[in-house]
Every structure is written in C-alpha cells, then in structure tokens.
Design a protein with these regions (language model features):
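Helix-loop junctions and terminal segments of transmembrane helices
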Residues: 1, 5, 9-38, 91-96
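Transmembrane helix-bundle signature of multi-pass secondary active exporters and lipid flippases
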Residues: 1-13, 17, 44-48, 80-84, ...
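Membrane-embedded alpha-helical segments of multi-pass transporters/permeases
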Residues: 7-10, 49-57, 115, 119, ...
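Interfacial transmembrane-helix starts/ends
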Residues: 19, 27-43, 47-55, 71-74
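Interfacial segments at transmembrane-helix termini and the short loops linking adjacent helices
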Residues: 35, 52-82, 88, 128
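Membrane-interface helix-loop junctions in multi-pass transport and translocation proteins
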Residues: 71, 101, 108-143, 155, ...
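Membrane-interface junctions at transmembrane-helix termini in multi-pass inner-membrane proteins
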Residues: 78-109, 149-155
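Membrane-proximal transmembrane or re-entrant/amphipathic helices at the cytosolic face
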Residues: 177-231
Length: 231
C-alpha cells in the first residue's frame, strides 16, 4: 500500500533539499516568500495526490498484481503522505527561528494522538483504520506547525483553500473505498476539480521549470499558455 504514496514523499524530499537553503537565506519579506512557495508547492501535491487516488486501482493491478488488495490502503496513506510533506516544509520555520524543540513537541502530539486513534479506528474499521489514523495524526501535526509558522514568521497557509482541497480528496478517497456505480467517473471528476482549483499554483511552478528543462521550446510553450490564459 505504501508503493504509490511513496511517490509523494519522494517528491517532498527532493523539494525540501532544494528549498531548505532558500528558506534560511531569504530574510526580507520572509512571510510573503514562505506563503507564496507553500501555495505553489501545495497545489502540486494536491494534484498529485488526487491523481494517485484516482488511478491507484489500475496501477496496483498492473504493477503490483500480487498485492492488488492493498489498493484499499492507498487513498488515506496518500492523504497522510501529503500531510507529511507539508509538515516537512513547515519544519523550515523552526530551522530559521532556531526552535527545534517545537518540532519535537508537534511530532510528539501527532504520535500520541495517532496511537490513541489507531486503538479505536482499527477496532472499528480494521486495517484501513490505521491509515485513517495516520492521516489524522499527521494532520494534527500540520495544524500545529501551521499555527507556529504563522506566529513565528507571519506565514499563511490559506486555511480555507487547504481545507477545501483536503475535503475533496477525502471525499474522493471515501468514494473509491465505497465503490458505488461508476466510481471511476466520479473520482475522475473530483480529480479534475482539484486540478482546476489548483491550476494557478501548478502553472506558477511549471513557468519556472519548463524554460530550464526545455530551453527555448519551454519559453515558447510558457508564452503560448500565458497568452491562452489571458484570453
């Protein structure tokens, strides 16, 4: 079940390695800088998470056919991995303010709540309950770190936007697990909604990366898409 969610955590690690230096060296306008980067980063992660949940069944069938049943664990593990990536990003606020003990306390709060929820959720829902508990436990860490980041550096995660994304992703996960008629269509529509909702953030990252990866062709593509958006 960890095979697909690991894609998100790997992306998070790559981003964090590149981001950490900028987080420490950027001093002027730090709150605005952190807020802008988080918005772009979270947009990409939300879109990736939606796609993983939507495609996890066919992908698990093709690539991990002997463990196909494990697809049941993918939806909420994907949500948990998304929270884990956010927690790693917000840890930068502790690094730049030299308050590493806050990182420890937030993780401890998440671990304790995770253990308590595991006890009850596994009783109620079996093994899937453990994935739900992981999501909520890491979600608690995310909320605590978001509050700390706001207090320490004035950063905003735009909680309304984040809540909408997580609500839609949770709805997609529940639809997939419930397996109603045409569940593939409904989860696909929710994935499309997530992508449209986060398009501005994803495109902001693409505008930076495409010219570096594709050179002149990338710049032409960026210009064409920008003109299309303006129309």
């Amino acid at each position: 079940g960890y095979f697909l969610p690991t894609i998100l955590t790997t992306l998070g690690l790559i981003f964090y390695d590149a981001w950490q230096l900028s987080a420490v060296t950027e001093e002027e306008g730090r709150a605005r800088f952190f807020t802008k980067i988080f918005r772009t980063y979270s947009s990409v992660l939300f879109c990736c998470a939606a796609g993983i949940i939507w495609l996890c069944r066919p992908v698990m069938h093709v690539m991990k056919s002997n463990y196909y049943y494990a697809w049941h664990f993918v939806p909420f593990l994907t949500l948990a991995s998304t929270c884990s990536c956010f927690n790693q990003f917000l840890n930068s606020a502790y690094v730049v303010n030299k308050k590493s003990t806050h990182s420890l306390w937030t993780m401890l709060a998440g671990a304790v709540s995770n253990c308590i929820m595991n006890y009850f959720f596994i009783k109620w829902w079996g093994p899937i309950g453990a994935t739900v508990a992981s999501f909520f436990g890491l979600g608690i860490v995310f909320v605590l770190r978001a509050l700390d980041a706001h207090n320490m550096i004035g950063m905003s995660i735009h909680p309304g936007r984040v809540a909408v994304n997580f609500d839609v992703l949770a709805g997609e996960a529940l639809l997939l697990l419930a397996e109603p008629p045409l569940y593939g269509l409904w989860t696909g529509l929710l994935t499309a909604a997530i992508i449209l909702f986060n398009f501005a953030g994803v495109w902001a990252m693409a505008r930076m990366l495409l010219p570096k990866l594709l050179g002149r062709r990338g710049r032409v593509l960026v210009s064409a898409v920008d003109n299309w958006i303006k129309k």
